[in-house]
Amino acid sequence: MGFLTKYGSFWEMIPQTQGRIFWVAPAADYTIEGKSYSAANDNDGLSPERALRTIDYAIGFTTANAGDVIVLLTGAHSVSATIAVDVAGITITGIPSGVPAPQARSSGGGTLNRTTITTTETSGIIFTVTVADVEIAYLHLIPIAAGSGISISNAGDRAYVHDCTFRIGAVDSTAQ
């Protein structure tokens, strides 16, 4: 696999950007195209093979309004605290799953790949957006019963949330 971090990606579904693309793995050990890798916040995150471990750490690497993108690799991401999206002009996205993925990337049984984020907090929010021009896309958010998926403050002008699904209680809902 090549180390493409600009102008899209080898999967041709990641947003094209003039900024950097940071990759975040769902677990400490993860597999891409049949190869195993270890995620760590000591990695630079600039390639799927060198993915970061946490979303919050990836946000810290981004530059405001430079077109930086954070890609959450397919799988079940879990957070223990609210993620403060406090860098303007970034995109946080999962791998789009609107169409069946090629066999090299798809799960067994013909299911579509999906990037999920679950919180382990007793109450709270998964993402709190406090800056302008943030895009959040292609994620399945599973907040706890007393929480919510995304909170956008008054300063979160032009926030763009699309192609996300939310589990609310025992029922999934869709925002498009």
Regions found by a protein language model. Name each.
Residues 12, 26, 53, 67, ...:
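Membrane-topology and secretion signals of cell-surface/extracellular proteins
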Residues 21, 67-69, 76, 82-84, ...:
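Detector for repetitive beta-architecture
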Residues 22-27, 53-78, 91-97:
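Glycine-rich repeat segments that build the extracellular carbohydrate-interaction surface of secreted
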Residues 88-148, 169-171:
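Right-handed parallel beta-helix/beta-spiral solenoid domain characteristic of secreted/periplasmic
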Residues 166-176:
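Solenoidal tandem-repeat scaffolds enriched in leucines and small polar residues
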Residues 55-64, 77-87, 102-105, 123-129, ...:
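Short, T/G/N/S-enriched strand-turn elements that build extracellular solenoid repeat scaffolds
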Residues 1-20, 63, 107-116, 140, ...:
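Extended, low-complexity segments enriched in Ser/Thr/Gly and acidic residues that occur primarily
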Residues 1-57, 76:
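Right-handed parallel beta-helix/beta-solenoid
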